[in-house]
């Protein structure tokens, strides 16, 4: 019976020591886990791939009391916070007595991953896998007693704030090359008045009056022939 009681006391005492020391290191959170990578200009088979697995698991255990036989050991006024804004952690003493732990507040940047794949031709290339995980856990202001009197747990607060993550900076787009001088469109022709056309005419040779002259000459020859045949000598008139 004594051995069982002794083992139980040792187990509870160890649990109490763990509850006291856990706020010193378990509640501490760093600036978060982040990963950044890029795959560019890696042609080939299964090349230029990026796998990122940032994990951020802040755990807060503060303001807890574990007592076998406890009297007036409150756990009150403790605060645990996980903030996404970057900053340094600080430790503040809690308003508790006995074996109560201290309150620790830390800031965390959360889990973030950023990757890019550009100009990576090939089979199964330029791919990216990102699995950011953020699992904040808060355990604060608890009181465990086997036999306890006046051990309240009040006024405790736990906060998880992921904060606003800044937008990733995108590289500027490359400007398109300008067209060569030969391909550039030149200025259009100016609208000048067309010069007047000169009328082309043939030289006057008198051929337009030849036809009436020929007709008159033919009439005269015909008339002379008729008169000659009529009045020729030896005719039977």
Curated annotation (Swiss-Prot):
Q: Which family does it belong to?
A: Belongs to the chaplin family. Long chaplin subfamily.
Gene inactivation phenotype reads:
A single chpB disruption has no phenotype; a quadruple chpA-chpC-chpD-chpH knockout has delayed aerial hyphae formation and sporulation. A quintuple chpA-chpB-chpC-chpD-chpH knockout has a longer delay in aerial hyphae formation and an almost complete lack of sporulation. The quintuple knockout still expresses ChpE, ChpF and ChpG. Quintuple knockout chpA-chpB-chpC-chpD-chpH has strongly delayed aerial hyphae formation, makes many fewer aerial hyphae but no effect on viability of the spores produced.
**Cross-referenced PROSITE patterns, in alphabetical order?**
CHAPLIN (PS51884), GRAM_POS_ANCHORING (PS50847)
Domain Chaplin intervals: 42-82, 120-160
List, in alphabetical order, the GO biological process terms annotated in this UniProt record: cell adhesion
Q: Where is the composition biased (Pro residues)?
A: 169-178
Report motif location: LPXTG sorting signal.
202-206
Q: List, as start-end ranges, the regions of compositional bias called Low complexity.
A: 101-115
Q: What induces it?
A: Transcribed during aerial hyphae formation on minimal medium, about 10- to 25-fold lower expression than the short chaplins. Weak expression in aerial hyphae (at protein level). Very low expression on rich medium, unaffected by ECF sigma factor BldN.
From the Swiss-Prot or TrEMBL record, give the protein name: Chaplin-B
Q: Which organism is it from?
A: Streptomyces coelicolor (strain ATCC BAA-471 / A3(2) / M145)
Subcellular location as annotated: Secreted, Cell wall
Q: Where is this region: Disordered?
A: 81-127, 148-216
Protein task: One of 8 partially redundant surface-active proteins required for efficient formation of aerial mycelium; the short chaplins assemble into a hydrophobic, amyloidal fibrillar surface layer that envelopes and protects aerial hyphae and spores, presumably anchored to the long chaplins. Chaplins have an overlapping function with the surface-active SapB peptide; chaplins are essential on minimal medium while on rich medium both chaplins and SapB are required for efficient aerial hyphae formation.
User: Which of the residues bear the PTM Pentaglycyl murein peptidoglycan amidated threonine?
Assistant: 205
Membrane topology, from the record: Peptidoglycan-anchor
């Amino acid at each position: 019976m004594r051995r069982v009681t002794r083992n139980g006391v040792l187990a509870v005492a160890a649990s109490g020591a763990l509850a006291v020391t856990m706020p010193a290191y378990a509640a501490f959170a760093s600036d978060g886990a982040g990963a950044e990578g890029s795959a560019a200009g890696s042609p080939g088979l299964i090349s230029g791939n990026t796998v990122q697995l940032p994990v951020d698991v802040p755990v807060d255990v503060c303001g807890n009391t574990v007592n076998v036989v406890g009297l007036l050991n409150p756990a009150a006024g403790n605060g645990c916070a996980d903030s996404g804004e970057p900053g340094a952690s600080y430790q503040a003493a809690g308003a508790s007595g006995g074996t109560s732990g201290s309150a620790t507040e830390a800031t965390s940047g959360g889990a973030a991953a950023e990757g890019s794949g550009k100009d990576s031709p090939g089979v199964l290339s330029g791919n990216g896998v990102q699995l950011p995980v953020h699992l904040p856990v808060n355990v604060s202001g608890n009181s465990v007693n086997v036999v306890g009197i006046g051990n309240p747990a009040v006024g405790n607060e736990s906060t998880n704030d992921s904060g606003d993550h800044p937008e990733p900076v995108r590289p500027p787009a490359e400007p398109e090359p300008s067209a060569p001088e030969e391909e550039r469109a030149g200025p259009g022709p100016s609208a000048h008045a067309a010069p007047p056309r000169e009328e082309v005419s043939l030289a006057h040779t008198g051929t337009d009056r030849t036809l009436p002259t020929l007709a008159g000459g033919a009439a005269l020859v015909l008339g002379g022939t008729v008169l000659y045949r009529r009045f020729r000598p030896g005719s039977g008139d």
